[in-house]
Design a protein with these regions (language model features):
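Glycan-processing catalytic domains of CAZymes
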Residues: 1-298
C-alpha cells in the first residue's frame, strides 16, 4: 500500500492541531511515530512511500517499506535535496528509490487534450501552456535516472485525447530509448554526507503543506541549529527555498557550484554507512552520545 504524501499532510494538518503540543523534539518524534504506526497497521504494514517532504528516514526505519520516492515539480520542494534525503535513507535501510515528475504547478497543469481549458492562474485548469514546463520535466526525468532510481516517469498527460503521444509522452519515450542505448548510468558518486540530528524534525523553510514558515515537526519554530541546516543546504543548492513559488521555475533544480555531491543522513546512521562517505558534514546540533561513533571515522 502507498503512503503517499502523508508526511506533508501530517506536518500541515495534524501537527499544528496536536494537544498538548509538547516542546520536546523527542516527544514530537514519538507523536509522529504513533501516527504512522497506526497508518501502517491499518494498511497491512507492507508499504511504499511517495514522500512530500523529507521524512523518509523515519518511514524506512520501521522495516515495512519496499520502495521510496518523491513527486517533483508541482508545488513541491527542490528535487536535488529531496533525493539527497531519499538516497541517504535508501542506502541506510536497503530500500530502492524511484523518480516521479509532476505536470502540475501552483497555477494549473499541462494538458494537450482538445478539451483543455487553459484558464490562467486556475489550479484546476489544464492547457498546453500551463503546468510544469517541458524543459523542467525533461531535466527531472534524466536527473532521476542519474540518481540511481529503479523506475522513473511522469504522473500523466502523456497522450493527446488517448490517440497519440503528447510532447510529455515523447520525452518519456525518448528516455526509454536512451536507457536502451546507453544502459545503466552507473552508481552515482556522492562523497559528502550531511548529518542532522535524528530527533530534529527539520524540514524545508517553506513548502506547499503549510503557510507557516521555518517550522520543525510542523509546529515548533526553527532554532539556531535548524538555520545551520538550511544554510548548509543552501551552500550546496543555492536558492533551493524558491522551488515552486515562481513561474520561472527557479529552485527546483539549482545551479549548484559543486554538483549533486551529497546525501543526507541522520545521527542514527551506523558506522558502516558513514564509512561510505569520505566527507561527513555535521549540519545540525546532535544529541549527546554520538561522539564515539563519529570519532571512529578517523
Amino acid at each position: 500500500m502507498d503512503n503517499g504524501e502523508q508526511d506533508g499532510r501530517y506536518v500541515g494538518s495534524f501537527a499544528p492541531r496536536m494537544y498538548p503540543l509538547g516542546a520536546d523534539r523527542k516527544q514530537q518524534y514519538f507523536n509522529f511515530q504513533r501516527h504512522f504506526q497506526e497508518m501502517g497497521d491499518q494498511l497491512g504494514n507492507k508499504m511504499a512511500t511517495l514522500v512530500s517532504l523529507n521524512f523518509g528516514h523515519y518511514f524506512l526505519k520501521e522495516g515495512v517499506y519496499t520502495l521510496i520516492g518523491a513527486e517533483t515539480a508541482q508545488g513541491l520542494p527542490n528535487s536535488q535535496i529531496y533525493y539527497s534525503f531519499i538516497r541517504g535513507a535508501g542506502k541506510q535501510y536497503g530500500v530502492n528509490w524511484f523518480g516521479n515528475a509532476s505536470v502540475w504547478n501552483r497555477w494549473g497543469w499541462k494538458s494537450y487534450d482538445s478539451n483543455a481549458e487553459g484558464i490562467d492562474n486556475d489550479y484546476n485548469s489544464g492547457g498546453p501552456l500551463k503546468g510544469t514546463s517541458l524543459g523542467l520535466l525533461k531535466r527531472l526525468i534524466y536527473t532521476h535516472l542519474m540518481y540511481d532510481c529503479v523506475a522513473v516517469g511522469f504522473e500523466g498527460s502523456m497522450r493527446i485525447d488517448d490517440k497519440k503521444l503528447s510532447p510529455i509522452g515523447k520525452i518519456q519515450q525518448s528516455a526509454v530509448k536512451w536507457v536502451d542505448k546507453y544502459g545503466d548510468p552507473g552508481v552515482m558518486y556522492t562523497p559528502v554526507a550531511l548529518m542532522t540530528d535524528f530527533f530534529s524534525g527539520w524540514s524545508f523553510p517553506r513548502h506547499l503543506y503549510s503557510r507557516q514558515a521555518y517550522k520543525v515537526w510542523g509546529n515548533l519554530p526553527y532554532e539556531l541549529p535548524d538555520y545551520l541546516t538550511d544554510g548548509m543546504l543552501d551552500v550546496l543548492y543555492p536558492g533551493y527555498q524558491d522551488a515552486s513559488y515562481y513561474k520561472d521555475e527557479r529552485g527546483f533544480i539549482t545551479p549548484n557550484p559543486y554538483g549533486d555531491i551529497a546525501d543526507c543522513l541522520m545521527s542514527d546512521a551506523p558506522l558502516w554507512v558513514l564509512k561510505q562517505y569520505p566527507v561527513l558534514v555535521i549540519a545540525d546540533e546532535l544529541h549527546p552520545g554520538q561522539e564515539q561513533r563519529i570519532r571512529a571515522l578517523r
